[in-house]
């Protein structure tokens, strides 16, 4: 009985730790948002996310190359995003990275949204709408990625099936 307070304290600590571990989701990112595949990789991508938020595309690509987490869906999504948004966009490279992200994590909302936008940039409305349908299934409730791609598709259609960058 003398050890009962210590045992109860240990039990409470373990219970709280397991609740926190079960509840820990992906940390919000400056841009682009996406579910993550692992905490260590997420932390190693923080510098690249900061460069992306600052719209320093070339520097972000160099940082991502330095990290070289090719087996991480977020890394591939960020590489695709940076290549697509660069001053001289490299759409084939962006598509390769988005596809790699989706091979690793088929429901990766960021890669689904951004690859849909890439398809609009190429004038490929049917493939963009496929991505929108995939996002509709991936998002249990309306999510930002679905709403953003839906808006991009609407702008595309309203502009005579020509890509219009986000305002």
Locations of regions flagged by a protein language model:
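Structural marker of alpha-solenoid helical repeat scaffolds
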Residues: 67-70, 104, 137-141
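Alpha-helical segment of the N-proximal tetratricopeptide repeat
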Residues: 39-68, 84-85
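TPR alpha-solenoid repeat register
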Residues: 75-77, 111, 145
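Structural signature of tandem alpha-helical TPR/SEL1-like repeats
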Residues: 54-59, 87-100, 123-131
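Long, contiguous interaction/recruitment modules in multidomain scaffold/adaptor proteins
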Residues: 1-42, 167
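Register position in tetratricopeptide repeats
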Residues: 53-54, 85-87, 121, 138, ...
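Canonical tetratricopeptide repeat
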Residues: 78-79, 114, 148-152
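Terminal, low-structured helical/coil segments at or just beyond the last alpha-helical repeat
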Residues: 25-39, 129-167
């Amino acid at each position: 009985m003398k050890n009962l307070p210590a045992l109860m304290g240990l039990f409470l600590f373990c219970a709280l730790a397991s609740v926190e571990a079960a509840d820990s989701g992906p940390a919000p990112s400056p841009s682009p948002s996406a579910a993550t595949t692992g905490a260590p990789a997420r932390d190693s991508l923080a510098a690249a996310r900061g460069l992306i938020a600052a719209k320093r595309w070339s520097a972000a690509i160099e940082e991502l190359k330095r990290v070289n987490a090719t087996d991480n869906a977020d890394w591939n999504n960020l590489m695709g995003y940076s290549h697509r948004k660069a001053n001289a966009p490299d759409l084939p490279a962006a598509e390769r990275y988005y596809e790699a992200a989706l091979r690793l994590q088929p429901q990766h909302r960021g890669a689904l949204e951004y690859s849909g936008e890439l398809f609009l940039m190429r004038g490929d409305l049917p493939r963009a709408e496929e991505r929108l349908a995939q996002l509709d299934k991936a998002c249990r409730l309306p999510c930002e990625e679905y709403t953003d791609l839906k808006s991009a598709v609407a702008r595309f259609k309203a502009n005579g099936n020509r890509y219009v960058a986000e305002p």
